């Protein structure tokens, strides 16, 4: 539970590991993470294949019960739930530097924004969840409201994610493994392009 978690650095690190684990699952091949940019081509499916849910996207005729689309919805909200857990609770972790806490929260803000970006570009109006609990009766928000949250999250991530991580597990051999400032800026550019109708 969140009221007893985040009692040490191990808890903080474990919460990020859990977040990245959910992200990895949401990006796996058994999930339609490319729904909103692979449709209409020959990459995702072909007539003799067994991937009927993908074929519906290629034909721009997606049914309400499309299993891959449902999976994408569920996976994105799992990421949002894990990100909210960190955003709402990590700050109270004792005996951890403020910088480490800021970076952890910034990564969570990035992944929440990333997930909402997928949701809004696929469905348009979606519910906004800012707590760990998923409210299945939450009202749908306008696309403008969702984009406001996305940009707000990305600006926090841009401020607090370092350009280069120098310690494991976030950096290794001079390469970033976790979300960096550059990744945030690139995502923000894509978001602005979508908002302007160019992507």
Could you say what each language-model-derived stretch is?
Residues 9, 13, 17-27, 49-123, ...:
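Conserved, well-structured interaction surfaces
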Residues 28-34:
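Beta-strand acidic-aromatic groove motif in beta-rich domains, primarily in extracellular
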Residues 130-133:
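Outer-membrane beta-barrel translocator domains and adjoining extracellular loop/strand segments
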Residues 176-187:
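Amphipathic alpha-helical protein-interaction segments enriched in hydrophobic
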Residues 190, 196-199:
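Polar, glycine-rich mid-to-C-terminal structural blocks
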């Amino acid at each position: 539970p969140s009221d007893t978690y985040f009692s040490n650095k191990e808890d903080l690190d474990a919460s990020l590991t859990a977040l990245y684990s959910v992200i990895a699952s949401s990006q796996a091949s058994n999930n339609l993470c490319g729904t909103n940019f692979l449709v209409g081509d020959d990459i995702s499916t072909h007539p003799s294949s067994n991937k009927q849910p993908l074929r519906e996207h290629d034909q721009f005729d997606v049914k309400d019960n499309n299993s891959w689309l449902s999976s994408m919805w569920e996976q994105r909200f799992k990421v949002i739930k894990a990100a909210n857990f960190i955003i709402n609770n990590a700050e109270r972790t004792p005996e951890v530097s403020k910088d480490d806490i800021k970076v952890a929260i910034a990564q969570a803000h990035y992944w929440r924004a990333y997930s909402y970006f997928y949701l809004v570009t696929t469905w348009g109006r979606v519910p906004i969840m800012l707590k760990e609990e998923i409210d299945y009766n939450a009202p749908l928000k306008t696309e403008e409201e969702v984009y406001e949250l996305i940009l707000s999250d990305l600006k926090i991530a841009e401020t607090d994610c370092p350009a280069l991580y120098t310690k494991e597990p976030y950096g290794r051999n001079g390469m970033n493994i976790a979300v960096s400032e550059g990744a945030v800026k690139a995502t923000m550019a894509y978001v602005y392009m979508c908002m302007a109708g160019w992507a």
